[in-house]
Amino acid sequence: MQKNDDLLRERRKDEHVALGVKQNEQLAPSSLEDIQLIGTSIPRYNVKDIDLTTTIVGTNVPFPFYINAMTGGSRHTKKINAELAEIAREVAIPMAVGSQSAALKNSSLIDTYKIVREINPNGMILANISPEVALQEGLRAIEMLEADALQIHINPAQELVMQEGDRSFSHWLTRIEKYVKLSPVPVVVKEVGFGMTRETVATLASVGVQSVDLAGKGGTNFAQIENDRRRDQAYDFLLDWGISTGQALIDMQHQDAPKIAYLASGGIRNPLDIVKALALGADSVGMAGQIIYSLKKEGLTKTIEKLELWKEQLRSLFVLADAKNISELKTTPLIISGELAKWGTLREIDLVKLANRK
């Protein structure tokens, strides 16, 4: 039985990658297209003046984007993790691994994650677990990677669509609180592409969580992936569940939203998307499916070159936004239009204030 469970887990990991790559050929809207930055025609800064440094859970990093959690737990995904680690090392950006549950249950799979630290010994690496993982096992996940931080992914929609997924969730908050108190490294609680509302963030903040990844809709759709894995495809009505990245970011502009650090991910396609997310308060911006898609279609060298170009393009966008650094960018006026504006109005977000901030 254990061997069958292990094989099922490995197959699921490979299917996640294959289906995720297929999805990234044509991504769903992330609502970021409804956000417009108001720039300047007389910039105060030169490109060389721009400072892209930021912090993730208290760690200073030179660039405001990172490789988000996606994979690990099979022979095939070991190779992908190795290439992602090489990208992270060469581009000097943080990296999170995919859920380590497979390796915690089957020690023969530990190397599919550990390869990341071997290739990138000095980089910032985030371990990744579910709230289902007991504390001692979670500490093993951190040790496995000599991780600098711990991602705890919350994914009820994915679990419910997954035939072999979890069906009990009421203990998650207590488990998360325990990790926040006892983890030897900082904790980030992240969604997996269904987005966090400000109410969810407030609930997490109430138990001591100090950093979240809003992880909205628009990138890899795990409801669709799990539904595609089912023979009956019985949950096709749930494929649009959740809130988009833009909606999650706008929701955090509400006057009653908790004042904690947040990251953004989900459907990030280019440097302009990164700048929009940073302008709406994110400290850094994560990408997973798009990077793996680039790896598959363009190869390792081209993917590294693309991300290096993004750094220069980010500096150009900061100049156009008249912002020397991320702190200044967070005061840049923004126009919210289209469906996102309608959504924000119903959620009582002061869009006029956003449009006229200084």
Swiss-Prot record:
Compartments in which it is found: Cytoplasm
Q: Which UniProt keywords apply?
A: Cytoplasm, Flavoprotein, FMN, Isomerase, Isoprene biosynthesis, Magnesium, Metal-binding, NADP
Assigned EC number: 5.3.3.2
Positions annotated to bind Mg(2+): E159
User: What Gene Ontology molecular function terms does this protein carry?
Assistant: FMN binding; isopentenyl-diphosphate delta-isomerase activity; magnesium ion binding; NADPH binding; oxidoreductase activity
Q: Is the Flavoprotein keyword given for this protein? A: yes
Reaction(s) catalysed by this chain, per the record, are: isopentenyl diphosphate = dimethylallyl diphosphate
Primary residence: cytoplasm
The record's GO CC annotations read: cytoplasm
**Residues where substrate binds:** R12, K13, Q158
* Binding, FMN: A69, M70, T71, S99, N128, K190, T220, G267, I268, R269, A288, G289
The cofactor(s) it depends on are: FMN; NADPH; Mg(2+)
Q: Which NCBIfam families match?
A: IPP_isom_2
This protein's assembly is summarised as: Homooctamer. Dimer of tetramers.
The text of the family note is: Belongs to the IPP isomerase type 2 family.
- State the protein's name: Isopentenyl-diphosphate delta-isomerase
Q: Which organism is it from?
A: Listeria monocytogenes serotype 4a (strain HCC23)
